[in-house]
Swiss-Prot record:
Listed GO biological process terms: DNA replication initiation; regulation of DNA replication
Entry binding sites for ATP: 171, 173-175
Function description: Plays an essential role in the initiation and regulation of chromosomal replication. ATP-DnaA binds to the origin of replication (oriC) to initiate formation of the DNA replication initiation complex once per cell cycle. Binds the DnaA box (a 9 base pair repeat at the origin) and separates the double-stranded (ds)DNA. Forms a right-handed helical filament on oriC DNA; dsDNA binds to the exterior of the filament while single-stranded (ss)DNA is stabiized in the filament's interior.
GO molecular-function terms, A-Z: ATP binding; ATP hydrolysis activity; DNA replication origin binding; lipid binding
UniProt-annotated stretches for the region Domain III, AAA+ region: 127-343
Location of the region described as Domain II in the Swiss-Prot/TrEMBL record: 83-126
UniProt name for this protein: Chromosomal replication initiator protein DnaA
Region entry Domain I, interacts with DnaA modulators, spans: 1-83
The organism of origin for this protein: Edwardsiella ictaluri (strain 93-146)
SUBUNIT field: Oligomerizes as a right-handed, spiral filament on DNA at oriC.
NCBIfam families: DnaA
C-alpha cells in the first residue's frame, strides 16, 4: 500500500459528499500511512471530533472497499505532519476553488504575528465589537457550517480556510460572525492586528490616501494586518480603482499567510460590477452560505434574546412570533424589542394576545405579503414557467421540481396546513406536499443550485 490509498479515498469522498462539506472537513486533513495504520491529521480538535463523528464510517468503508481484509487501521490526531499536504484536484469544490500551490504552501508558515518585522509599528483601529461572540451566536441548521468555519478560522487564522467568504441575505448573522472571529483571534493573541470594516470604509480610506498623497502608507497599513474582515464586499462594484488596490492587498495578505474574511449578500460569481480576477480569488478558500433561520432556530434566537434582557418569554409566545416572522434575525430581534418595550410601558404580561396587539401592523404586513398565490406566481416567474403548470398533473422535472419548491416555500412561509397547501396545488394529497418538502430539504443539502434557488426565493418573498 502507498499514500495513493488516501488519494483514492479523497477522490471518492469528493464525489460522494456535498462540495462545501468536502472543502470544510475533508480537504484540510493530512494523511500518513505506516505499519498498516492510516493516520489522519486534523488542524484542530474541533475538526478532528467532527470528522470522527460524521465521516469515520465513510472513510472506513472506502478503506475496506480498496483493501479488503488488508485495510489499515484508522487513527486521528491533532496537528500536522512535516510534509506537504496531499493535493486534491481543483474540482474538489464548485464553491471553493483550490488556490495556487504557492498560496497553499504558505498556509503552513508561522502565523504572521509571530514573525519579526523591521517596519515601524502602525496604529490599528480594530473596530471589532466585543459584544458579538460565538457564545451568543445562536446556531441552527441554516448557519451551522458558517459558524463552524468561522470558529476554525478564529482558532487557526491563515490556515486552510483563507479567504473565508460568507454570503446570504440581510440580517442573517454574517456581521456577527465577522466580529466573533475577530474577538476569537484577539482572545488567543491579544496583540494580533485585527481590522474589521465595511467595504465602503476601505474605499473612503483609499480616497483620503490619494488626496493626501499617502497611498504608500495606506498600502502598508492594510497589508500588515494579521486579519482583515470586510463586510458587504459587493459595494466594491463598479469602483475600479478600489478594486485594483484591493486586488493587490488581497494577494499580499494571502502570500503573507494573513487571514481574510469577506461577506456579501450573494454568491461571489453573482456579484455584478466586480472584476472576474477578484471574484475568482474570493473562491480560493472556502465559500459558505448563511440561509434564513428555520423555525427552531428562530424560536431559539427569541428565547436567547429575551434571556439576555432578563425577560421571561413563554415558549408558546416565542413560537407564535417565530412562525410569523421568517425573513431574518434582525426582524425577529426588532419585533421582540417592540414587545418588550410595550410590556414595560403597560405593565402587562407577555401573552399571545398581547403580542398580536403589539405587532399588529407587522403581522398584518407579513400575512399580506406571503400567500400561497404569491408564492406560486413568484416561483413560476423564477423558473420561467406558468402558474398553470404548477397546478397541472405534469411530472417532467422542469415542472415537478418548481412545484416541489413552491410547496416547500408554502410550508415554510405560510401558516397553512399540509392539506390546505395540497388543495392549492391542484387538489393534491397532503402526503405529496410532505414528500415535496422533504425532497427540497434533501436537495438543499446536496445541490448548490437548489440551495441558491431556495435562498433567492425566500429573499424575494420576504422582502
Amino acid at each position: 500500500m502507498s499514500l495513493s490509498l488516501w488519494q483514492q479515498c479523497l477522490a471518492r469522498l469528493q464525489d460522494e459528499l456535498p462540495a462545501t462539506e468536502f472543502s470544510m472537513w475533508i480537504r484540510p486533513l493530512q494523511a500518513e500511512l505506516s505499519d498498516n495504520t492510516l493516520a489522519l491529521y486534523a488542524p484542530n480538535r474541533f475538526v478532528l471530533d467532527w470528522v470522527r463523528d460524521k465521516y469515520i464510517n465513510n472513510i472506513n468503508g472506502l478503506l475496506n472497499d480498496f483493501c479488503g481484509s488488508d485495510a489499515p487501521v484508522l487513527r486521528f490526531e491533532v496537528g500536522s505532519k512535516p510534509i506537504v499536504p496531499v493535493a486534491v484536484s481543483s474540482a474538489a469544490s464548485s464553491g471553493a476553488s483550490v488556490p495556487p500551490a504557492a498560496v497553499r504552501a504558505s498556509s503552513l508558515a508561522r502565523p504572521s504575528w509571530e514573525r519579526v518585522t523591521a517596519q515601524p509599528e502602525l496604529s490599528y483601529r480594530s473596530n471589532v465589537n466585543p459584544k458579538h461572540t460565538f457564545d451568543n451566536f445562536v446556531e441552527g441548521k441554516s448557519n451551522q457550517l458558517a459558524r463552524a468555519a468561522a470558529r476554525q478560522v478564529a482558532d487557526n487564522p491563515g490556515g486552510a480556510y483563507n479567504p473565508l467568504f460568507l454570503y446570504g441575505g440581510t440580517g442573517l448573522g454574517k456581521t456577527h460572525l465577522l466580529h466573533a472571529v475577530g474577538n476569537g483571534i484577539m482572545a488567543r493573541k491579544p496583540n494580533a492586528k485585527v481590522v474589521y470594516m465595511h467595504s465602503e470604509r476601505f474605499v473612503q480610506d483609499m480616497v483620503k490616501a490619494l488626496q493626501n498623497n499617502a497611498i504608500e502608507e495606506f498600502k502598508r497599513y492594510y497589508r500588515s494586518v494579521d486579519a482583515l474582515l470586510i463586510d458587504d464586499i459587493q459595494f466594491f462594484a463598479n469602483k475600479e480603482r478600489s478594486q485594483e488596490e484591493f486586488f493587490h492587498t488581497f494577494n499580499a495578505l494571502l502570500e503573507g499567510n494573513q487571514q481574510i474574511i469577506l461577506t456579501s449578500d450573494r454568491y461571489p460569481k453573482e456579484i455584478n460590477g466586480v472584476e472576474d480576477r477578484l471574484k475568482s480569488r474570493f473562491g480560493w478558500g472556502l465559500t459558505v452560505a448563511i440561509e434564513p433561520p428555520e423555525l427552531e432556530t428562530r424560536v431559539a434566537i427569541l428565547m436567547k434574546k429575551a434571556d439576555e434582557n432578563d425577560i421571561r418569554l413563554p415558549g408558546e409566545v416565542a413560537f407564535f412570533i417565530a412562525k410569523r416572522l421568517r425573513s431574518n434575525v434582525r426582524e425577529l430581534e426588532g419585533a421582540l424589542n417592540r414587545v418588550i418595550a410595550n410590556a414595560n410601558f403597560t405593565g402587562r404580561a407577555i401573552t399571545i394576545d398581547f403580542v398580536r396587539e403589539a405587532l399588529r401592523d407587522l403581522l398584518a404586513l407579513q400575512e399580506k405579503l406571503v400567500t400561497i398565490d404569491n408564492i406560486q406566481k413568484t416561483v413560476a416567474e423564477y423558473y420561467k414557467i406558468k402558474v398553470a403548470d404548477l397546478l397541472s398533473k405534469r411530472r417532467s422535472r422542469s415542472v415537478a421540481r418548481p412545484r416541489q419548491m413552491a410547496m416547500a416555500l408554502a410550508k415554510e412561509l405560510t401558516n397553512h396546513s399540509l392539506p390546505e397547501i395540497g388543495d392549492a396545488f391542484g387538489g393534491r394529497d397532503h402526503t405529496t406536499v410532505l414528500h415535496a418538502c422533504r425532497k427540497i430539504e434533501q436537495l438543499r443539502e446536496e445541490s448548490h443550485d437548489i440551495k441558491e434557488d431556495f435562498s433567492n426565493l425566500i429573499r424575494t418573498l420576504s422582502s
